Amino acid sequence: MLEEILDRRNLEKALKAVISNKGSGGVDGMQTDELRDYLTHHYQVLKQEISEGNYRPSPVRKVLIPKAQGGTRMLGIPTVKDRLLQQAIAQWLSPKYEEHFSKNSYGFRPNRNAHQAVLQAQQYLQSGKTKVIELDLEKFFDTVNHDRLMHSLNKMISDSRTLQLIRLYLRAGMMEEGMVNQRQEGTPQGSPLSPLLSNIVLDELDKELEKRGHSYVRYADDCSIYVSSKKAANRVCAGITEYIETKLKLKVNAAKTKVSYPTGSTLLGFSFYKYKGKWEIRIAEKSIERIKAKCKLITQRSNGKSTKEKISQLKQVVVGWVNYFVIARAKSVMEKLDEGIRTRLRICKWNEWKRPKARRRNLLRLGINKSKAYQWSNSSKGFCRIAHSPILCSALNNAYWSMQGYQGFYQHYHNRTKLQTSLF
């Protein structure tokens, strides 16, 4: 098994994946663009070290990133060399586990995604299972029990050297401010092996849910169970919580785990509402608030960037966000987001013109008559009032922003939903 993992063809495939994913370097400072040259010159030595059990992974670099819902998420960034080896292990092991994983598990798996999880949840609701148990595992990636995980791996992996290498990666120290702290638990996010290991751990939960006959969807550590009554939901919630904490040795966040009605539930940034007797998918309010905050940051009046640069940034954000939420019924949401952003862009443009003379010249160029251009260019009204004025709304209208490169949320959403309709 280890020989196949360290085979040149497998390592070449892993190398391409690591280089493609880019990312910052680890504690040794080596970058992804240096990795191919390193492997060319050190392949035989590296292979021998690992085969003889003499290889020792470097500590991971601790990084804290803000979570979308508040707080921080801890990442452990391995060196690019360790990233290469972890990727080689993961891509060799993944097909072996795929045939055993649950059909209701959608995260970090080939040909599976968040949309499929949400659409499956919609089917459960439509079938009458309208009580939702939203499970929240407290600091899951940081608290995975190593012994239980290794016990699970033992069932699939017979090669003791491969098992030892994986354990070394689990136990690799974490460097923070120059100090290395040893790890006794967890499989921190940031490494190529972590997603597969997390699914192996939670596959036990999947099997237990299936054994009990529950309807559920799981995406990584985000799991929702669908039942028909509140009484059943409370019973299931208590039973599964006990199983997770006693059998899997994981902690359920009691404050965030809840039983809710679909309209009050959230799944991967989506929620649901009932329309004409059918459960429809919508964008969760928190997701809308987060994108508003992100766009607000980009369109700050005085952040040192031109309106053109802001539009370029917005375009990337809009395309990614709409592509993710395209399965939701969200026409009015997209229109309202555009309305708010165009107002902020008008403020940016008015600020960019700065002086009355420049404002007057630009208003005239955009078709505003001379008297109105003179009146508004000398106005002492605040930016917000100017941005909402009929004059500026007329001068800097939707067509103007389209010419500047801002197509907007609604236009991209319309194009994507139209494309989906034509495909199906």
Question: What are these language model-derived features?
Answer:
Residues 1-38:
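Non-catalytic, polymerase-adjacent accessory regions of viral genome-replication enzymes
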Residues 11, 59-60, 68, 308-325:
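Core structural elements
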Residues 39, 43, 337-345:
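Short amphipathic alpha-helical coiled-coil/interface segments
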Residues 42, 49-64, 68, 100-264:
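Conserved polymerase palm-domain catalytic core
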Residues 171, 247-319:
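A conserved non-catalytic segment of reverse transcriptases
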Residues 182-185, 296-310, 321-333, 350-355:
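Short, solvent-exposed helix-loop connector elements
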Residues 256-265, 313-317, 334-342, 357-365:
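A glycine-rich phosphate-binding loop feature that marks nucleotide/adenosyl-phosphate handling sites
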Residues 353-424:
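Extended C-terminal regions of large enzymes
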